[in-house]
């Protein structure tokens, strides 16, 4: 059972975070990816001061093209607008996984710049590590005037539900001038002006090996950087706290760690990839032992963006959803007692051949964590992550919170027993062989740390 001293230590961490006062009327939830796309395009079209788009990638497909064209249109109509886009340096200069690197997103950014002379929409490539596998720009948020449109989504056809398929995420718009300024200033000083950051919309950009030393130093500088602001809200009022971090000792990681044990009744977690760091698993077990309820909503393996249907050619990356399911099955087998008593509720999300990308936490009715953080070892150690922690002590967001969770649960089934999940023996032959080979050389543990 969590001792009072330990719980107070966790609550003390949250109490000491600087909090910005927030009006309930200035928080808007969107519940579907198409609504998010329309809201983003409307915000861009009506912006009067600044547009700062930060995402893992802005893809050269219909969805991505619609966003970049809207940015060029806004800048052309209002030249005084400060417009900038920031994406991951490495991701922008390769094709999709398994595709050739010809005609990359960076090549497209260059063409758009050439086709729109005199209309400057800079696209910056942020290198979080010397290789994409060892760290990416996973910072999220679209800062438009005094609003932050926050989602874990990147910008392409499926995230924006441009056509038939969608990738489900969370979407909030928070109007808060102080928070928008804090985030914008941090992006300006640490990303736009960062060592090793270069424009991708210029053909004269350097090659990655040429800036390797800059990237290494830059990564250390990112580790040491954080938001600096003073809070202006009491602990009994609705407030928001922006968080940013890189590396396992970041303030963001510490806050996630301390947030979980503060649940008095119930903790709800969403993650698309079930691969929780060990210390978060320990938090969950301690909550269960002290009589609290824990709900975990994850994607079914077929709703994973890396899933390859059995009738398509198999690629190694297609083993990932199975590795995540193995993790979940092992976790449930340890905690089957709490599943039987309905204290531990695990839901699998599946909606036809759409995919699931939700992440975040809800602690009782008091705390909500909006984040792009997948709550996995990769997010914990390698990627640049951020979040917005909402404190709602008077439960003013209760209706929106319940609607969001109701819609998330809509396409889920509850796992009643760990044997409801397939075992390795049930997997397709190629997947089974690969996983057994990985286990034999113990590389599956290494993979779990970087994915």
Question: What residue spans do the PLM features occupy?
Answer:
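Short, catalytically relevant binding-site loops at active-site mouths
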Residues: 274-276, 301-304, 376
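Generic beta-strand/beta-sheet core signal
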Residues: 54, 86, 144, 151, ...
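Short, surface-exposed basic-aromatic patches at helix termini and helix-loop junctions that form
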Residues: 69-76, 282-290
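Short, glycine-rich nucleotide/cofactor-binding loops
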Residues: 57-62, 270-278
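Short, solvent-exposed amphipathic alpha-helical segments in soluble enzyme
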Residues: 188-189, 283-286, 405
